[in-house]
Each structure stands twice: as C-alpha cells, then as structure tokens.
Amino acid sequence: MAKDARLVRDPHQKEIVRLFSAFDGSKNRRKIFEDFITVSACAVSNLLDTVHYEEREKRYLDTIRQYKRNEIDVFAKMYGQIELGVEEKPDQDFLGEMYMALDFGSAAAGQFFTPYSVCQCMAAINTDYDRLNAQIADQGFIGVMDPACGAGALLVAFANECEKAGINYHHSVLFVAQDVDYIVGMMCYLALSCMGCAGIVCIGDSLLNPITFHDSRGLLPIDTDGRIWYTPQFLMAPEWAGRQLAARMDLFAHGGRSKREPEPAADETPAIAPPSQIQPPTAAEEAETPVVISPEPEKPVEAEETAYGDNEFGQLMFF
C-alpha cells in the first residue's frame, strides 16, 4: 500500500489508499473502492431525497452487509478524507485523479479522464463569464451541463472559475451531469455534493437516453427508473426549493407546459373573403397580366435548438 500511496499527491488521497489495508484479502481494491463510492453516494442521497430513499437504502444495505463491522467503520473514515480533501483544496479532481492513478479505469471502454489542469484551461478559456453574469442578473441562475461528466472534473473546474469571476455558484448555478458509468457518475455526484453545488446527476447514455426535463430551465428532470441523483444543496437550499416550486406551479398553470405559447391577437388574423364573394378575373385582366411560373425559393434549414441551449463553449452546455 505504501507504493500505491506514492501514486497520488494529496495527503487525504494517500490516507484513503492507506486505509485499503484495513480490509481483508477477500476483495480486490477496485471492488472495495466501488463499494465505498456506492455506500457513500447512497448515504448522501438519503439525507434529503425521500423519493428514492427505499431503493437506495436497500442498495446501501446490500453492499454494506458484505463487510465486517470494523471495515464499515473504515468506509466512514474514507468518506471523511474526501470531505477534508475537498474543503482544503476545492480546485482539484479529488476522486477522479485517484481513480486513474490506481488504474481503476476501464481501458476497454475508453475510460480516460481529462487531466484536471486541462479542465481548468477549458473552463477558463471557453466560457464567457460576462455573458453568464448577465444571464444570472436577468433570469436568476444559469444551468450548465456536462453530458459525459466522468468524475466531474470539468464541472468542478467551472465552479472554481465561477468563484474567481465573482459568481456564487452555490446559489446561481445549476449543475447537470450525465455519464453511462454508474461508479464514475457517483464520483461526480459526491464531488458536486462535497463542494455544495446544486446539482442533478443522471446515470445513462447521453446519446441513446439523454436526461430530459418537464420544464425549460432544467429544474424538474423526468425520472422513471431511479437514475436521477439530487445533491443536498439542490434539495435543501431555500432559493433552489423556491425555484422548483415555481416551476411546478408554472407547469400546473399551463397544463403541463413550462411556457404558454402566445395566442395571436385578433388584428393579426388575415381577413379572408368567403369563396362565394371571390370574383374571377375578367378576360381583359387575364390578357394584361403575364403569368410567370418560377420555382419557390428553398428556405434555409434552421438547426434545431437543443434542450440545453447552444454548446459553443465546447463540452459544457449552458441553458
């Protein structure tokens, strides 16, 4: 384990690696790590999410019963190291970096996380923070989505860049993440939760089964199979609870639509005479008026707007 500890840099990462030695040899390190992520995510979710409580409590118990009492206590110590590591140095990919350093990634599935330094560069260069500030002033908050989030490094980097730009991401940014891999999606969920981000994490293929919402602001995700995970900040902060309530009231008022389509005004309807009042042209008028047949010009095909707005900022999509 001492050799493995040299693979990671953060002292709290090193402590987690050291704690692996407390488990017996019946399970390999990757299995222990994945079970640790599962029980930690379920415990965080069940603090406030009553909708998914029973399902996740069962998953928690099914996982934890595979371990001895002293090993369960080690899981609690490992989670404490995540909290301490993120609190002391929020500008890092705490879990993702450790996951790759210990070679837990799936090379067969092409699972290689973007280095955090690259994520920092992407978040700093590709984002127009003046525009985002203007949107926050106009609409109250912005939404940002990473459709292939991994352990959440790009969203974490974006949150830290928001703080540098004077944007309070706890109250003014809604983080939406999706990944096809359950474990790395839960790593992203823990990262966003520990940073106090108001977030929604969806487990699933973002191409074949992308996350969808009842509303246009991304506050009310459609969840039919328990794949949606809400961070504590999203459920507990008064401003986010108020925004969700307002979105539900808007849906109720508009019959299930988040935006009511404006009805045409009475004077906008063109006046069309009934067929009985339409007079055919005279022979003289037909002779004087040349008939020119020309093909109707083709209308340019407009790109359909995505559910999350444009993605001119690269992998991150804003809405």
Can you annotate each of these PLM segments?
Residues A2-G166, L316-F319:
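Class I S-adenosyl-L-methionine
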Residues H12, H52, H170-H171, H214, ...:
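Histidine (H) residue identity feature
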Residues I16-F20, V173, I228-W229, F234-L235:
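Generic preference for hydrophobic/aromatic residues in regular secondary structure cores
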Residues Q81-G85, M187-Y189, E304-E305:
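Intrinsically disordered, low-complexity boundary segments flanking structured domains
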Residues L102-D103, H170, Y308:
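Homeobox/homeodomain signature
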Residues V118-D223:
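Conserved S-adenosyl-L-methionine
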Residues A191-A198, C202-G314:
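S-adenosylmethionine
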